Amino acid sequence: NQFYFYAWEITMSVQRLHVTSRYCEVAIAGNLVHLAGQLADDTSTDITIQTQQTLANIDRLLLEAGTDKSHILSVFIFLKDIEKDYAAMNAVWDAWLAEGHPPARTCVESKLYAAEVLVEMTVTAIRPD
């Protein structure tokens, strides 16, 4: 048996988009794209609208980074109340997801940074060649 090992060549330079003093919204290294935690623009709304807005922000940032949701490798989803909001979040997620391209996904309950935030998502994707 022969084993073949493949390695991604990742350059040492990192491109950062939407940079603040504390973090950036997007970090790109080679063909890897990492998004900071994304939230809804209007956190006074319910889980359905917050999830829609969060996913729209993800779409926008992925496009800006040169990729799209069909190239997402993994998503971490943080819900304020998983028992209450899991089904509604999943309904929006399922409608948004690129058919045939489900990413690796983790969904957990978490105390988020503000009481009105119901969902936050972090994403890792690749840029197509």
Give a label for each model feature.
Residues 2-129:
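N-terminal presequence-like segments and the immediate start of the first folded domain
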